[in-house]
Amino acid sequence: DFTPVCTTELGRLAPEFAKRVVFIFGPDKKLKLSILYPATTGRNFDEILR
């Protein structure tokens, strides 16, 4: 939700509980990895893919 329209309408927008989510799908279009972590943690996609 890049523009917080859905999260605001559903009442799910709480900045103090902000999280980041990463989903990685394989060539077969199946979910291979799902990570949920605090927004205070930085993103390093090279490290995730490793």
UniProtKB/Swiss-Prot annotation:
It catalyses: a hydroperoxide + 2 glutathione = an alcohol + glutathione disulfide + H2O; a 1,2-diacyl-sn-glycero-3-phosphocholine + H2O = a 1-acyl-sn-glycero-3-phosphocholine + a fatty acid + H(+); a 1-acyl-sn-glycero-3-phosphocholine + an acyl-CoA = a 1,2-diacyl-sn-glycero-3-phosphocholine + CoA; 1-hexadecanoyl-sn-glycero-3-phosphocholine + hexadecanoyl-CoA = 1,2-dihexadecanoyl-sn-glycero-3-phosphocholine + CoA. It is found in: Cytoplasm; Lysosome. Disulfide bonds: none annotated. Keywords: Acetylation, Antioxidant, Cytoplasm, Hydrolase, Lipid degradation, Lipid metabolism, Lysosome, Multifunctional enzyme, Oxidoreductase, Peroxidase, Phosphoprotein, Redox-active center, Transferase. The active site is at 6 (cysteine sulfenic acid (-soh) intermediate), 28 (for phospholipase activity). The modification Phosphothreonine is found at residue 3. Residues 1-50 form the Thioredoxin domain. GO terms for molecular function: 1-acylglycerophosphocholine O-acyltransferase activity; peroxidase activity; phospholipase A2 activity. Its main location: cytoplasm. Its EC number is 1.11.1.27, 3.1.1.4, 2.3.1.23. Irreversibly inactivated by overoxidation of Cys-6 to sulfinic acid (Cys-SO(2)H) and sulfonic acid (Cys-SO(3)H) forms upon oxidative stress. The phosphorylated form exhibits a greater lysophosphatidylcholine acyltransferase activity compared to the non-phosphorylated form. Thiol-specific peroxidase that catalyzes the reduction of hydrogen peroxide and organic hydroperoxides to water and alcohols, respectively. Can reduce H(2)O(2) and short chain organic, fatty acid, and phospholipid hydroperoxides. Also has phospholipase activity, and can therefore either reduce the oxidized sn-2 fatty acyl group of phospholipids (peroxidase activity) or hydrolyze the sn-2 ester bond of phospholipids (phospholipase activity). These activities are dependent on binding to phospholipids at acidic pH and to oxidized phospholipds at cytosolic pH. Homodimer. Interacts with GSTP1; mediates PRDX6 glutathionylation and regeneration. Interacts with APEX1. Interacts with STH. May interact with FAM168B. May interact with HTR2A. Belongs to the peroxiredoxin family. Prx6 subfamily. The active site is a conserved redox-active cysteine residue, the peroxidatic cysteine (C(P)), which makes the nucleophilic attack on the peroxide substrate. The peroxide oxidizes the C(P)-SH to cysteine sulfenic acid (C(P)-SOH), which then reacts with another cysteine residue, the resolving cysteine (C(R)), to form a disulfide bridge. The disulfide is subsequently reduced by an appropriate electron donor to complete the catalytic cycle. In this 1-Cys peroxiredoxin, no C(R) is present and C(P) instead forms a disulfide with a cysteine from another protein or with a small thiol molecule. This is Peroxiredoxin-6. It comes from Mesocricetus auratus (Golden hamster).
